Amino acid sequence: MRSGVIAQKVGMTRVYNDAGEHIPVTVLRLENCQVVSHRTEEKNGYTAVQLGAGRSKVKNTPKAMRGHFAAASVEPKAKLVEFRVSADNLIDIGAELTAGHFVAGQLVDVTGTTIGKGFAGAIKRHNFGGLRATHGVSVSHRSHGSTGSNQDPGRVWKGKRMAGHMGQTRVTTQNLEVVSTDEDRGLILVKGAVPGSKGSWIVVRDAIKSGTPEGAPRPAAVRAAESK
């Protein structure tokens, strides 16, 4: 099991394939995605790598985190994410991952925080049909209807779909195709839409349902850490 990467959502555009068909893609950018720490079976009980991405000003970084980054000889990061990996896929601390970590045609799972929509009714939030236009319905055409049963169970069931805050939740979209990558500019082009707003942090992993393709680099596509 390989590590994923932390990317930033740039936006959407389109590209054309060899047949002249346009493909809607989301552009994801890797910015200083480096290994900050390890988790090992002996010390932590599991194996993982901690990646950091982006840049954070030193004055805005807590002292404890400054020491954490200094131990890895990397600049303070804006985002930290931990990825479970197998022991043979551990990556050296300080190594920088590139867009070549993924290959064109492979499937990936993309995780992000959806755009918040605020308080929404049941029709918008859950695609309810609403009540009838006439026949006794008055001023409640867009309500969700009954909230439950009678004296038994005498309460509203957990998970009942009702009006409430819509969006701003952690969502994973599975099996998106990698259309192409640009290693020099650190870009990954993924077919279709990706959860999150422009500029938000996105986590990209090998698709759990299809696994790692044969042509993918192991343990990762890395740019050697700069010597100090």
From Swiss-Prot:
Modification N5-methylglutamine occurs at: 151
GO BP terms: translation
Claim: RNA-binding is one of the keywords in the record: yes
Family matches, as InterPro entries: Ribosomal_uL3, Ribosomal_uL3_bac/org-type, Ribosomal_uL3_CS, Transl_B-barrel_sf
Pfam families per UniProt: Ribosomal_L3 (PF00297)
Cellular component per GO, a single term: cytosolic large ribosomal subunit
Keyword match Isomerase: no
Keywords (A to Z) from UniProt: Methylation, Ribonucleoprotein, Ribosomal protein, RNA-binding, rRNA-binding
Transmembrane segments: none
PROSITE patterns recorded: RIBOSOMAL_L3 (PS00474)
Post-translational modification: Methylated by PrmB.
Gene Ontology terms, MF aspect: rRNA binding; structural constituent of ribosome
Function of the protein: One of the primary rRNA binding proteins, it binds directly near the 3'-end of the 23S rRNA, where it nucleates assembly of the 50S subunit.
Subunit comment: Part of the 50S ribosomal subunit. Forms a cluster with proteins L14 and L19.
Family as reported in the entry's similarity comment: Belongs to the universal ribosomal protein uL3 family.
Protein known as: Large ribosomal subunit protein uL3
